[in-house]
């Protein structure tokens, strides 16, 4: 699998596209209002993402509508692999232990994680 990496600004833009399915430059800018980005900064990020092959655009009136071409789950898998390798010395077990030791996780979420782990164990020969 090819590694996918997004610098912070590109990740913020991609998050808007994943959440909304598509967006114009203005819509991305509005969604990121807390960052107070200039229109040209958002446009530049989208153009860079398009050059990298992570988004595509279609004309919409006088503007362009941008669409993600990579799924959030695929980007997440790549990010988790980087974290596992760089922070947890390649150990998924250490990473998992860190996640489940979080005292702020609600019991319901821990139960869902347990079911996911049980299901995965049943798939493994």
Residue ranges and their predicted role:
Residues 3-9, 60-79:
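Short, cationic-aromatic polyanion-contact patches
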Residues 43-47:
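Short, hydrophobic-biased segments on the C-terminal half of alpha helices
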């Amino acid at each position: 699998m090819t590694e996918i990496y997004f610098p912070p600004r590109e990740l913020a833009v991609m998050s808007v596209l994943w959440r909304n399915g598509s967006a114009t430059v203005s819509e991305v800018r509005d969604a990121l209002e807390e960052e107070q980005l200039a229109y040209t900064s958002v446009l530049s990020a989208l153009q860079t993402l398009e050059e990298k092959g992570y988004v595509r655009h279609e004309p919409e009136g006088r503007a362009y509508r941008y669409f993600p071409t990579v799924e959030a789950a695929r980007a997440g898998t790549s990010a988790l692999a980087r974290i596992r390798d760089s922070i947890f010395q390649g150990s998924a077990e250490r990473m998992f232990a860190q996640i489940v030791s979080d005292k702020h996780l609600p019991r319901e979420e821990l139960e869902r994680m347990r079911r996911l782990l049980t299901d995965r164990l049943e798939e493994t020969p």
